[in-house]
Design a protein with these regions (language model features):
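Gly/Pro-enriched, hydrophobic low-complexity segments
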Residues: 74-75, 138-217
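Secondary-structure capping and domain/repeat boundary segments
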Residues: 218-290
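An acidic-aromatic
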Residues: 55-117
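Hydrophobic lipid-interacting interfaces of membrane-associated proteins
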Residues: 49-55, 93-94, 184-188
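Short, solvent-exposed coil/turn segments at beta-strand boundaries
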Residues: 38-45, 60-69, 81-87, 138, ...
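Sec-dependent N-terminal signal peptides of Gram-positive bacterial secreted proteins and lipoproteins
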Residues: 4-22
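Short amphipathic beta-strand and strand-loop transition segments with alternating hydrophobic
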Residues: 127-136, 183
């Protein structure tokens, strides 16, 4: 009987150790599993909150259709809401509805959305950290890592001298449940950031307000954009944009000195985005190098 009990205890210890044992995992696995596209194959949304000193200071909400980023501030909040077609930006007293343009016509904000991706918010360069340990328990994997020497050298200009991280992952999917980040700076200041991830979360309140507003026809105005007017490259596109918001046109820095905006076909009246934000609008875009 004693042998049976002893064997049972030994078996229990073995199973416990196995359940809490080391696990092989790479940062590349974590990085790949937490790409926005990968996460949204299994979830309708990804909601990421960064907390420091007990207060949320950054929110990211992602779906297949849009990316939302909100940062509360002492004097004013900062918010961006990006779809493939447009981007809302709230900073200070200005709320701007941007569209992206190129010399060849209208572009999209695919790159803007990528910058607010889950991988960008949750984990950076897969080669920028070194895993020190990884263990598995109760269906979760806990990974301890530190910045690589190269990453520390790259971050020297902002004063970071060291950093360590703790990832808590779903053992099956490798999806990040939480991330704790500890940064030490050359002035002796330490920053402790806790990142929590919620999958299939409800839409944040401010974003609900934006979506509800733009879904009401009476809140929209027609904006017609005529690119390269009077040339063989002329292109016209009409979109609906929210009333009350400044209508902005965004373009690459490389073409900044070659583009002009007007409100008449003869390209004599310069476009003033603050002039009237409630009525229908036509903007003529003249590219001076085409």
């Amino acid at each position: 009987m004693k042998k049976i009990v002893a064997f049972a205890l030994l078996l229990c210890m073995v199973l416990t150790l196995a359940a809490c044992g080391k696990v092989e995992i790479t940062l590349q696995e974590i990085y790949d599993a937490n790409q926005t596209e990968a996460l949204l194959k299994n979830h309708k949304s990804v909601y990421i909150q960064d907390e420091m000193d007990g207060e949320v200071w950054n929110e990211v909400y992602l779906t297949k259709e849009y990316a939302y980023n909100y940062i509360p501030g002492e004097d004013s909040d900062w918010m961006e809401f990006t779809t493939d077609d447009a981007r809302y930006s709230l900073a200070g007293d200005d709320c701007v509805y941007y569209v992206y343009i190129t010399p060849d016509g209208m572009g999209d904000f695919a790159n803007e959305r990528a910058e607010r991706s889950a991988s960008a918010a949750l984990c950076g360069d897969a080669e920028g950290e070194i895993i020190e340990s990884a263990s598995k328990k109760d269906g979760l994997i806990t990974v301890q890592s530190v910045l690589s020497q190269k990453a520390i050298e790259d971050m020297a200009e902002v004063g970071v001298t060291s950093a360590k991280f703790e990832y808590v992952l779903d053992a099956k999917t490798r999806e990040i449940i939480s991330l704790t980040s500890d940064y030490t700076y050359d002035d002796g200041v330490d920053f402790h950031v806790i990142t929590e991830v919620t999958y299939d979360a409800d839409v944040p309140e401010m974003l609900q307000t934006i979506l509800a507003y733009e879904n009401q026809t009476e809140n929209l105005r027609n904006v017609t954009i005529v690119s390269n007017p009077g040339t063989e490259k002329e292109e016209t596109k009409t979109i609906q944009a929210p009333k009350g918001l400044i209508f902005g046109l965004e373009f690459d820095d490389a073409v900044a000195e070659t583009v002009e905006f007007y409100t008449d076909a003869a390209c004599t009246e310069a476009y003033d985005p603050y002039a009237d934000t409630d009525t229908d609008l036509t903007i003529y875009i003249k590219w001076t190098n085409t």
